[in-house]
């Protein structure tokens, strides 16, 4: 699975993700070092790591962790996926790369490492944040979204609806909130014959659909629209997961919604996301196992 920031370790306390006493308002970031998560890591030279972080104060930053591949004690398990930590960062004037001096784990969800699909969902969201949000443009809401997804995974395992909620929220933060209920071109309510055009911002009414001829345009049925509307109306991935069990929606609705959002994301990023390819392989393997 490409894009995964290292192999998660074992948690010191498996119950910690659900324990409110672990930290007081961990996302507030009122003092101390920046709070953040690892999006990905790349080996650098013999003993260093190039670490891409998303922090509450600096947004997405790239830092060099000297000696991180030889000494685990210095960074105390904070360079893994599914870990929220405080990172001590420094940078020379006019320097491009930050230096990561040390880190302290604040909260961890690494007990999820045994669930390959949960790790795949977490890796996908890390790649989404890395790809969609600009460097060094802090958006604390992005960190909240990542943590909320991890909480949803810990609460009940992988959830397609929770993942759709994260996609919608991150697209919104990136300035490309998908049109779901009204036409992205004219603003009118949707009716029969609507399509979803990723390049034009989402839903397109029948009257405007004649000019939607680009690759990726697809039918936008009422069931798909209602499914996305229901998810967008929820308060984040933890509550959105309830939509998975809603009998109003069919497997076709869920698949169409997923494909529509993925097409929009892929168009914005300009390349396929490697973590999505891995998720597709996991899905195919699961279907074969049921046959």
Task: Show the residue positions of the predicted features.
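Non-catalytic alpha-helical scaffolds and adjoining flexible linkers that form interface surfaces
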Residues: 1-49, 54-291
């Amino acid at each position: 699975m490409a894009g995964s920031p290292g192999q998660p370790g074992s948690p010191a306390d498996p119950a910690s993700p659900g324990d409110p006493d672990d930290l007081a308002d961990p996302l507030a970031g009122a003092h101390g070092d920046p709070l953040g998560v690892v999006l990905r890591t790349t080996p650098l030279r013999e003993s260093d790591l190039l670490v891409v972080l998303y922090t509450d104060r600096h947004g997405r930053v790239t830092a060099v962790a000297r000696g991180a591949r030889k000494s685990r004690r210095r960074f105390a398990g904070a360079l893994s996926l599914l870990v929220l930590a405080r990172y001590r960062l420094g940078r020379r004037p006019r320097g491009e790369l930050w230096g990561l001096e040390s880190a302290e784990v604040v909260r961890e969800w690494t007990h999820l490492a045994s669930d390959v699909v949960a790790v795949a969902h977490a890796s996908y969201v890390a790649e989404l944040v890395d790809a969609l949000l600009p460097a060094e443009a802090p958006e604390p809401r992005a960190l909240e979204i990542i943590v909320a997804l991890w909480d949803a995974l810990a609460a009940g395992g992988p959830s397609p609806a929770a993942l759709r909620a994260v996609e919608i929220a991150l697209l919104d933060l990136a300035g490309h909130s998908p049109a779901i209920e009204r036409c992205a071109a004219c603003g009118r309510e949707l009716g029969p014959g609507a399509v979803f055009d990723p390049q034009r911002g989402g839903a397109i009414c029948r009257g405007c659909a004649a000019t939607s001829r680009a690759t990726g345009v697809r039918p936008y049925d009422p069931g798909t629209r209602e499914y996305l509307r229901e998810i967008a109306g929820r308060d984040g991935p933890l509550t959105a997961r309830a939509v998975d069990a809603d009998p109003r929606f069919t497997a076709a609705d869920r698949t169409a919604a997923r494909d529509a959002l993925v097409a929009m994301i892929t168009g914005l990023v300009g390349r396929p996301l490697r973590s999505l390819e891995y998720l597709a392989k996991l899905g195919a393997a699961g279907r074969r196992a049921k046959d």
